[in-house]
Amino acid sequence: TYLDISHPDVLMFLEMRKPTGDPNMRCLNLHHGINITDNFMKIVERCMTDPNADDGWNLIDPNSGLIRETVSAKELWQKILELRMETGEPYIHYIDTSNREMKDFQKEKGLKIHQSNLCSEIILPTNEQRTAVCCLSSVNLEYYDAWSRQPLFLKDVAEMLDNVLTFFIENAPNEVKR
């Protein structure tokens, strides 16, 4: 689960994996990440060179577009880094970089990156008409010697993943079919 750095719930969202956090908000089994924008990082960088710089960061309601609260970008960044040291999360995704580096043909189709998988190696563009799904597999390197000599092994793994997606598409409930 990713949340934008400007979302009004970002402070609570950051705390959800902290074992000492609010018990009503704790989600120790849910992994989470933050979409960090260029503008946020520019404010943080400016504060590093000028301690008196304005570090106000607006938390904006995504539905109304109204500013709900203004917080210190420097303190928010420090909180993110401290939580990463304590819990290993949140994951960080530089959303503007992902959108800037997207292929031109995808941009021309009106696609946009909204989030990533948590490890950030899979970043798929979407829009209202196009949903993306990431189907991953892993191979146990302990058994590398056993499978590396099998010429069809990786092809079989890829085909198995394709079969998983095909099965889902063919058996999806009507409300999620297009």
Regions found by a protein language model. Name each.
Residues 1-151, 170-178:
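Active-site cavity-forming subdomains of large catalytic enzyme subunits
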Residues 149-167:
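An acidic intrinsically disordered interaction segment
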